[in-house]
Each structure stands twice: as structure tokens, then as C-alpha cells.
Regions:
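Active-site-proximal alpha-helix that buttresses catalytic centers in soluble enzyme cores
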Residues: 1-132
Length: 132
């Protein structure tokens, strides 16, 4: 086992969406988090989901839970297609507030999904399915 692997900080990923009053919408984020959890074994130790508003867990709750499970570094991913006020201002402010209680924890906020060839594949897949 490499030294880097032995001493790597325990990392958590929090996937954040807007949140909805519709259970089905919130359940989709749970499923995404489960899929990511299965795909990133060995790279990310803890995977959580959170909502900006309208549903639980909140960003603060997911941050606190990650720390309680031993996270030393937290990566927050805004699960949004495009950059905007939520991903550029609201989520960073909410994460900063949550992190205040845990000054020993480092955190990073990723870019939203954005433009990526795999997004195009998903769009085309949806078009083909709609055409049937």
C-alpha cells in the first residue's frame, strides 16, 4: 500500500440539489448519491446528499453528519446543470456557514455538471426513448 493511500484524509462528498416539495424529486437525489457511492469506493469514503431548501437533510445537516462519521475533507458538488446564483453564491454561503462549526475540516465546492460529452449522451438517450 502506498504511503499516500495510507495517510490520505478521510473524504466525504455531499451532492446538493435545490430540494423540492415533491418526494419523487428528492428521492432522485438519494438514488444519485447511492449510485455515486457504489462507483467511487476507495476514492470517497462517505457520500451524502443534501438539499438547499424545502427538504431534509440540509447542507448543514449533511456536513455535520459527514464530520460525525470521521470526514476530514469534504467535497460539495452542486447537482445543477448550469452555473448560477445557487451554485455560485447560495451553496458556497451555506457550506461556509456549516463549516464554521468545524474549523479543522477542509472543504471544496466543485463546479456544477455543466457541458460534458456524457451529458450529450444522456440528452440523446432521452430523445431516442421519447421517439419510441
Amino acid at each position: 500500500m502506498s504511503t499516500e493511500k495510507m495517510y490520505r484524509k478521510k473524504r466525504a462528498l455531499i451532492i446538493v440539489d435545490h430540494g423540492s416539495s415533491f418526494k419523487e424529486a428528492n428521492d432522485m437525489l438519494i438514488e444519485i448519491a447511492n449510485m455515486v457511492r457504489q462507483s467511487c469506493k476507495g476514492e470517497i469514503d462517505i457520500v451524502k446528499h443534501a438539499h438547499m431548501e424545502l427538504a431534509k437533510p440540509t447542507i448543514s445537516e449533511a456536513f455535520n453528519a459527514s464530520v460525525a462519521e470521521g470526514a476530514e475533507e469534504i467535497i460539495v458538488h452542486p447537482y445543477f446543470l448550469s452555473p448560477g446564483m445557487h451554485s455560485k453564491e447560495d451553496i458556497p454561503n451555506m457550506v461556509k456557514e456549516a463549516a464554521r462549526k468545524h474549523p479543522h475540516i477542509t472543504y471544496t465546492i466543485t463546479e456544477p455538471l455543466g457541458i460534458h460529452p456524457k451529458i450529450i449522451d444522456v440528452v440523446l438517450d432521452r430523445v431516442v426513448k421519447a421517439d419510441r
